[in-house]
Amino acid sequence: MVQEIDLGLTCDMHVHVREGAMCELVTPKIRDGGVSIAYIMPNLQPPITTLDRVIEYKKTLQKLAPKTTFLMSFYLSKDLTPDLIHEAAQQHAIRGVKCYPAGVTTNSAAGVDPNDFSAFYPIFKAMQEENLVLNLHGEKPSVHDGDKEPIHVLNAEEAFLPALKKLHNDFPNLKIILEHCTSESAIKTIEDINKNVKKATDVKVAATLTAHHLFLTIDDWAGNPVNFCKPVAKLPNDKKALVKAAVSGKPYFFFGSDSAPHPVQNKANYEGVCAGVYSQSFAIPYIAQVFEEQNALENLKGFVSDFGISFYEVKDSEVASSDKAILFKKEQVIPQVISDGKDISIIPFKAGDKLSWSVRWEPR
């Protein structure tokens, strides 16, 4: 029985750390959860769309967690220009641009219309030239009236997939990630796009998978706001497809937690519950539990390290710390609440449950 695994430089390619007191609480927890490299989301208020702001935000994060490597991103909006994309890339200020369809998730009001991306094609062209990554929140906004086919939380991701395929056809060398996949149809689409891929360096379109979507179905959030997120967890067949993809060892599926902290009072509303699951403090142990249950621990390093590093082309010279993550057998109990002892309290994913694995850090 495996008791210890050297995971090397682990990476979580979809992380929310917010601002202010919440940021101060959760940013150091990235390393606590066994993650070395974190790709940071730009959906602050207002969104990150300027060079000065993304540089300042990274400085703030680096001060809070000096041993964590932060990869930064812009928020896709009309404020971006091709010249800004080129400048930010050449200054190594960003690794990608995140696309939020307007209104589908937290702080997405400034997002774009996913029915027509043509206005942003000059941006995508500049990104392709700079080898930047386009990160897609792959959902269409809900539509419940008129003669149009209804779109709702259970089919919003599937409705978005034709837009993903069109973007790839129009920009075949642009690196694209369908973030936090939740559906069997999304997994099939990513596999179809990659049917001729032989190795990790060939991947142009990838998908991130979260920890919580490998555990949850619709029944788990319908009566529990702590498990409510966007995109929502779906049906048992969808979860089965996600788990199969995660443990497959295919280089176009890798880890992005979409860990999204909210103050406990914002998750306890009877109306307007904030979407987001907080998983950062135990990120790698959650994933290890799934891989162990699937008898696939030999593929864990690819999912939480190698494939993400390859897709984002992270070099050793860029990392803040070369320490390696060692996963080892040691039971731990997830606390009911994580707090700064002052004003901020958050409920972690699977609060009160036991995990079989822990993480420590060792020099490489």
UniProtKB/Swiss-Prot annotation:
<comment type="function">
    <text>Catalyzes the conversion of ureidosuccinic acid (USA) to dihydroorotate, the third step of the de novo pyrimidine biosynthetic pathway.</text>
</comment>
<dbReference type="InterPro" id="IPR004721">
    <property type="entry name" value="DHOdimr"/>
</dbReference>
<dbReference type="InterPro" id="IPR002195">
    <property type="entry name" value="Dihydroorotase_CS"/>
</dbReference>
<dbReference type="GO" id="GO:0006207">
    <property type="term" value="P:'de novo' pyrimidine nucleobase biosynthetic process"/>
</dbReference>
<feature type="binding site">
    <location>
        <position position="14"/>
    </location>
    <ligand>
        <name>Zn(2+) 1</name>
    </ligand>
</feature>
<feature type="binding site">
    <location>
        <position position="258"/>
    </location>
    <ligand>
        <name>Zn(2+) 1</name>
    </ligand>
</feature>
<feature type="binding site">
    <location>
        <position position="16"/>
    </location>
    <ligand>
        <name>Zn(2+) 1</name>
    </ligand>
</feature>
<dbReference type="GO" id="GO:0006221">
    <property type="term" value="P:pyrimidine nucleotide biosynthetic process"/>
</dbReference>
<protein>
    <recommendedName>
        <fullName>Dihydroorotase</fullName>
        <ecNumber>3.5.2.3</ecNumber>
    </recommendedName>
</protein>
<dbReference type="GO" id="GO:0046872">
    <property type="term" value="F:metal ion binding"/>
</dbReference>
<keyword id="KW-0665">Pyrimidine biosynthesis</keyword>
<feature type="binding site">
    <location>
        <position position="180"/>
    </location>
    <ligand>
        <name>Zn(2+) 2</name>
    </ligand>
</feature>
<comment type="pathway">
    <text>Pyrimidine metabolism; UMP biosynthesis via de novo pathway; (S)-dihydroorotate from bicarbonate: step 3/3.</text>
</comment>
<comment type="similarity">
    <text>Belongs to the metallo-dependent hydrolases superfamily. DHOase family. Class II DHOase subfamily.</text>
</comment>
<feature type="modified residue" description="N6-carboxylysine">
    <location>
        <position position="98"/>
    </location>
</feature>
<dbReference type="Pfam" id="PF04909">
    <property type="entry name" value="Amidohydro_2"/>
</dbReference>
<feature type="binding site">
    <location>
        <position position="137"/>
    </location>
    <ligand>
        <name>Zn(2+) 2</name>
    </ligand>
</feature>
<keyword id="KW-0862">Zinc</keyword>
<keyword id="KW-0378">Hydrolase</keyword>
<dbReference type="GO" id="GO:0005737">
    <property type="term" value="C:cytoplasm"/>
</dbReference>
<feature type="binding site" description="via carbamate group">
    <location>
        <position position="98"/>
    </location>
    <ligand>
        <name>Zn(2+) 1</name>
    </ligand>
</feature>
<feature type="binding site" description="via carbamate group">
    <location>
        <position position="98"/>
    </location>
    <ligand>
        <name>Zn(2+) 2</name>
    </ligand>
</feature>
<dbReference type="InterPro" id="IPR032466">
    <property type="entry name" value="Metal_Hydrolase"/>
</dbReference>
<dbReference type="GO" id="GO:0004151">
    <property type="term" value="F:dihydroorotase activity"/>
</dbReference>
<dbReference type="GO" id="GO:0005634">
    <property type="term" value="C:nucleus"/>
</dbReference>
<dbReference type="GO" id="GO:0044205">
    <property type="term" value="P:'de novo' UMP biosynthetic process"/>
</dbReference>
<dbReference type="InterPro" id="IPR006680">
    <property type="entry name" value="Amidohydro-rel"/>
</dbReference>
<keyword id="KW-0479">Metal-binding</keyword>
